[in-house]
Structures are given as C-alpha cells and as structure tokens.
C-alpha cells in the first residue's frame, strides 16, 4: 500500500504538524494514495483534509520509506515530500486529527512521533534524500 507524508512549510518557515486522534502522537500530515490518484494529488488532498492548508508547490522529495514495521497497521510504502503551503490552519477531518500546530524548525516537539515520522522529519532537517 502506498502512502504519503507531507512536510508542510508555511511562508514564515514553520513546519505544520497534526496530533493524531488514534494514538495521540504528533505526526506529519498524510495518508494513503486513493485508487486513480497520483502522489502529488494525494499530497494536495491529505494536506487540505488534515490541515486546511493549500498546496502551493512540492519543493522536493525527502524520501521513500518502506520498512515493514514503519506503520503499525499495515505494510505501507511512504513517499515523503516537502511542500510549500498557504492558508489558514484548520482541521477538516476531525476523525483523524485532534490538534494542529506550527513549529519553528528549532522548536519541534521532543516527544515521540507517530509511525516513523520523527525519522522522516530528521532526514528532512539534515537535508537528506532517503530510500529506506
């Protein structure tokens, strides 16, 4: 199963995270690619559903993460991209996200994150492109 994670960057440089309702952990917005969708369309849709933000452009591919244990629910392959975003933060899908917040890169939450999102974020901050 293919999914996406988005590293949304606001015009002021802050990174937007959501708190997942299912496990209470901070996470990158994202989700599964729907039948008939390409990855950029999924990124745009999931970004709007989970944050209310609009995709301006996908800046770069951060990586492809495929470890069988990266998602506790299923074996999924996650395509991670940095995205320039605009708009007002507002959760659209309240079944998936309970909170939304923007963080400066030097003040990201230190608590554990959902799935392998801490690694994805660290790879991004280290300016890496990963195939894992």
Per-region residue spans from a language model:
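Active-site-adjacent beta-strand/loop module that shapes the phosphate/pyrophosphate-binding cleft
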Residues: 66-89, 124, 128-129
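Conserved Nudix-box catalytic region and its N-terminal flanking loop in Nudix hydrolases
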Residues: 10-53
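A generic structural micro-feature
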Residues: 55, 71-77, 94-97
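Structural detector for helix-capping/boundary residues
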Residues: 4, 31, 45-46, 103-106
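A short coil-to-beta-strand element that immediately follows conserved catalytic motifs
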Residues: 54-63
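Structural motif
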Residues: 15, 59, 76-80
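Conserved N-terminal beta-strand and adjoining loop/helix that marks the start
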Residues: 1-15, 82
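Nudix hydrolase/Nudix homology domain
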Residues: 24-26, 95-132
């Amino acid at each position: 199963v293919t999914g996406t994670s988005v590293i949304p960057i606001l015009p002021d440089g802050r990174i937007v995270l959501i708190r997942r309702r299912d496990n209470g952990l901070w996470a990158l917005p994202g989700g599964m690619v729907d039948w008939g969708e390409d990855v950029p369309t999924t990124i745009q849709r999931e970004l709007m559903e989970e944050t209310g933000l609009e995709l301006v452009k996908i800046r770069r591919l951060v990586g492809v993460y495929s470890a069988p244990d990266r998602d506790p629910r299923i074996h999924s392959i996650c395509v991670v991209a940095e995205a320039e975003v605009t708009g007002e933060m507002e959760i659209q899908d309240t079944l998936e996200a309970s909170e939304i917040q923007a963080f400066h890169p030097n003040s990201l939450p230190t608590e554990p994150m959902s799935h392998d999102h801490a690694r994805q974020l660290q790879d991004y901050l280290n300016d890496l492109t990963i195939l894992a």
